[in-house]
């Protein structure tokens, strides 16, 4: 199965430009994500209008050969970026990423492609929950320890058949959009694959120091 990666850069980042463009460990989250995705797939960056010029400027001087930039319709929310990305894709399967997850584990995109080849229609990397999970009452008093054996943390990137993602996007016209919630609401079966213990969602610039430390401990592609 050949997949195309879609990387949305929605309007919300117009108020949080550091989360896209500010360097962490020498590389911006945008370039780090594109570099990791391009190692396994063609990449379509689908960007809201106010951020389009900055994204184009950030790519200048990078030696990307499999990356295209498309501009979403207004108002440029995540769902509109995904629609624009899908319109630019000519493969039957796609991988969707989120810039708030700036590190992508080695082999994750390949594992997604394998699951899609085996006829999964929605594929998401996940890891077991290892923290102790507690239940509390309305007053904040701890009442029980929950069984975590069936709990998973779901990560990015996420794979879909292009038709299924288009169906989910078409149903959701505006507002916050999460592919997992949309798939579950639509009754779409979701296949989980092995995720990455070091993948995490970060809030930049707040978490920049932590992210830099994490990057320093893992085998990261060299800056080019």
Question: What are the roles of these predicted feature ranges?
Answer:
Residues 1-54:
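N-terminal glycine-rich phosphate-binding loop and ensuing alpha1 helix
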Residues 1-10, 33-36, 179-180, 197-199, ...:
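SAM-dependent methyltransferases
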Residues 30, 85, 97-98, 128, ...:
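Residue-level signal for inorganic ion chemistry
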Residues 40-41, 91, 119-122:
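Short, high-confidence coil segments that cap the C-terminus of an alpha-helix
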Residues 55-59, 112, 133, 211:
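Hydrophobic packing residues within well-ordered alpha-helices of enzyme cores
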Residues 61-94:
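Short phosphate-binding loop-to-helix
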Residues 99-103:
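Acidic metal-phosphate-binding loop of nucleotide-sugar-dependent transferases
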Residues 104-194, 224:
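Conserved core of the sugar-phosphate nucleotidyltransferase
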